[in-house]
Amino acid sequence: MSLFDWFADRRKGQFVGKVSQETEESDGLWVKCPECGQVVYRKDLHANASVCSNCGYHHRIDSDERIVLIADQGSFKSLDRNLSPTDPLGFKDRRAYADRLRESQASTGMKDGVVTGLCQVEGMPMAMAVMDFRFMGGSMGSVVGEKITRLVERATAQGLPLLIVCASGGARMQEGMLSLMQMAKISGALERHREAELLYMPLLTHPTTGGVTASFAMLGDLILAEPKALIGFAGRRVIEQTLREKLPDNFQTAEYLQEHGFVDTIVPRTQLRKTLASLLLLHGCKAKKAAGK
């Protein structure tokens, strides 16, 4: 076994097993819930925001589905859609980074792993970024960082509240230091947004890990999370081996983080839009008046 193979095997077990075990059947009329085993009619699952009606398990959804659930119908206006990543390091492990990018772009129809734009929630304007785990595990490279930074800067300039839906394995190793510097770049933009006394809310979904957790995911005025989402920096196995202690079964879950003060509230997906609207109202946001009124 080569050094790379050894490292890859170790990395596979770095995070809680649920992430890899929750793969769902993507074709057909029925979906089996990985939490309770219930077989659900796909249309019924989608009608319930992809939440299992039997156990409440939140199935993973893509960025398009997320936008439909949050934004007023027809209100989302995408920004920087044509920004596309390059391969500045000529990186290659088992496969070339350029090949991985092309594969992810073909399978998702996206240029990179985040969609950014402006929208309304019950008539109230808001800037929103939605990370998509389908694209290379939602990893944060230079384009993801640039798009989020541009969105934060636009929100600051226009006096808008900001929501970032996080779903990521962390910084994209194929871009090396260029990916790591996005942590500081986004954090700096968020600090200027905070200085303008504007609301920022990250929504932590399953999973939110690595460099994303270590930067903008934890810098919100109000930190929201979906039920049972995996949230952490290093993986469970790494922490246990470092501390030489057994960690609690619910360690790195949204519920554990809320109990220890790292998450403000856990919001079921079916209640998210209503909750966001209430929080926007609470922070003084007002609905736009219809034209001619």
Curated annotation (Swiss-Prot):
Task: State whether keyword Secreted applies.
Answer: no
Which locations, inside or outside the cell, does it occupy? Cytoplasm
Q: Which cofactor does it need?
A: Zn(2+)
The alphabetical list of record keywords is: ATP-binding, Cytoplasm, Fatty acid biosynthesis, Fatty acid metabolism, Lipid biosynthesis, Lipid metabolism, Metal-binding, Nucleotide-binding, Transferase, Zinc, Zinc-finger
Chief localization: cytoplasm
Q: Which reaction does it catalyse?
A: N(6)-carboxybiotinyl-L-lysyl-[protein] + acetyl-CoA = N(6)-biotinyl-L-lysyl-[protein] + malonyl-CoA
Question: Which InterPro entries does this entry report, sorted A to Z?
Answer: AcCoA_carboxyl_beta, Acetyl_CoA_COase_Trfase_b_su, ClpP/crotonase-like_dom_sf, COA_CT_N, Znf-ACC
The UniProt annotation places Zn(2+) binding at C33, C36, C52, C55
Q: Does the keyword Lipid metabolism apply?
A: yes
The annotated pathway is:
Lipid metabolism; malonyl-CoA biosynthesis; malonyl-CoA from acetyl-CoA: step 1/1
Q: Which GO terms describe its cellular component?
A: acetyl-CoA carboxylase complex
Looking at the record, the residues that make up the CoA carboxyltransferase N-terminal domain are: 29-293
Q: What GO molecular function annotations does the UniProt record carry, in alphabetical order? A: acetyl-CoA carboxylase activity; ATP binding; carboxyl- or carbamoyltransferase activity; zinc ion binding
GO biological process per UniProt: fatty acid biosynthetic process; malonyl-CoA biosynthetic process
**SUPFAM superfamilies, A to Z:** ClpP/crotonase (SSF52096)
Q: Where are the zinc fingers (C4-type)?
A: 33-55
The record's comment on cofactor binding reads: Binds 1 zinc ion per subunit.
EC number, UniProt record: 2.1.3.15
Sorted alphabetically, which HAMAP family does this protein's record hold?
Answer: AcetylCoA_CT_beta (MF_01395)
Subunit note: Acetyl-CoA carboxylase is a heterohexamer composed of biotin carboxyl carrier protein (AccB), biotin carboxylase (AccC) and two subunits each of ACCase subunit alpha (AccA) and ACCase subunit beta (AccD).
Function, as annotated: Component of the acetyl coenzyme A carboxylase (ACC) complex. Biotin carboxylase (BC) catalyzes the carboxylation of biotin on its carrier protein (BCCP) and then the CO(2) group is transferred by the transcarboxylase to acetyl-CoA to form malonyl-CoA.
Please report which protein family the annotation says this sequence is part of.
Belongs to the AccD/PCCB family.
Name of the protein: Acetyl-coenzyme A carboxylase carboxyl transferase subunit beta
Q: Which organism is it from?
A: Prochlorococcus marinus (strain MIT 9313)
Taxonomic lineage of this organism?
Bacteria, Bacillati, Cyanobacteriota, Cyanophyceae, Synechococcales
